[in-house]
Amino acid sequence: MGKKPKYDLILFTILMLLLFAPMVQKRTGWVKMEPLKGFYPSTPYPLLSLKDFRTGDYQKQMEQQLSERFGFREPVIRLYNQYLWDFYRKTYAHDIVAGKHNWLYYEQNVNDYYGTEMYRWLPDAQTARVTFNREARLMWKLRGVLQDYGVEFLMFMAPEKGFLYPEHLPDRKHDTTTINAREYYVAQFEENSFPYIEMTSWFQALKEADTLPYSLISQTGAHWGFSSVLAADSLLRYMEALKGESLPQLAIGPFHESADSTQSDDHDLEMNLNLLRNLRHPYDRLYDAEVTVVTDSAVKKPKVLFIGNSYLWRMHYYIPFDELFEQSEFWFYNSIAYSGPGYKDQTPVADLNLIEKVLDADYVVWFTTGNQMYKATYGFVERALMNFCVEDDKVNKTRESLMDSLSLSWKEANQILINDPEHYFSELAGDSIPTARNSKVRETLVINEIKEDSAWMWNLSTCQTVIQNATLKQVLLMEAQNIIEGKPLMRDMTNIEAKRDRVEQLVADMVEEVRGKPVLMQQIEEKAAKNGISVEKQTLYDARWLVNDKIKRGVINLETP
């Protein structure tokens, strides 16, 4: 009996710790927790209102918010996930499927192997055929358009894990009534003589030969590892053959066991399970080596635009792209453009000049996997064809017509055009390569030619000081228009200082002319008030714009007195 109070004290202490330790941890974070992997949406702290309190919405939001932020949340979730995995081989991780022998797959890889992935994107096999035929035809058309400008467009399909290691997939029933996108597109590419590399078949042969010291794709990973270097070399050699160029070689050093950080990326699916302990990987051989780029005076470093999925990131991890390419960009899912050293610069693709970017490349590579071919090129091919072959005004008017007639938003109307551009634009219809061209294409080609001439660019930068308030980009466009319209070139202008003085005198004369027009001055006063500047400064801005506009239109010729 004497020991009972002691036990009571111990139990009471444990109870208090269980009650208050999470509260203290939440407030102070005194124990450092390893963050959970993956994406977890954050619920904002709810604002209390009488309406939400009475309907129960406030309580639901607060409960959700608290469940995402209680102390020691990370180990509690890992403990629960471990319990689910050990006893039921079950996971709540989005899109991750547990295979046999502790293998992990993305859901779409499993679906594609068993023939059901098509239903995620298309209602039936007939619709799939129509869609795939149209996409393959549009790719062929775009390639023909770009070849006119020395740009090669090709397809690269990385290997699918489900088809490479089907023996570890969970048992499911095959659906034989559907169409496999990878196999269908390969047949279309062969028929259309469209250049492509399909890696699944080749990697299946490599797996059977079993001569490589490293795994092609890891047991619990979604993406390939060092095998991506082998694929990159094949891509380079194929690009060489397409244009008859000598491109850099990749040299592979001695193999060694992969570092822990690299192995963590090789097990990215497992990391997203958020278990307490790591799974065993008896099937993995995780080795890599240093990769160097070999060039000489006869080698050309290409300019490449990649558009596609996350499989490129592992290739980028092992290979020094900055040394391999003169320049390269990666348009991730045709949404975010990664560029610059190490692909550290990010820009929304929608903000970029597509014509300029594509014409600045030697090769445009659509980089994907077979299971993602159901979504084709995420609208890249359609948008590129409209940009290259249809005038901007026509595209805008067609979009506006859809918006007005169907009460659609800009985004909805634009998606209709993307879904079937051949239907809305006669320039893209039919089974032949489009011959119509957007006038912006000629402008871009001329500007690219100017940029290649350093002396020309220097002259234009000098002219920029004459045409004040004009950016170099605007001056380049003005010079391109001069070439297209057969006007005198700014490059050939002489006596720059004298011309600058003349422009300033023309601006001063225009200021006096504007001041003598009461109606115009009233408009300037309204603009000055709106812009928050003085009337004098607004008058100067408007006078300079009028002079620059007359110079641009040829009304004022700086070459004549």
Language model features: what each stretch is:
Residues 540-541:
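Short, charged, amphipathic alpha-helical segments
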Residues 1-515, 519, 526, 530, ...:
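Extracellular glycan-modifying ectodomains
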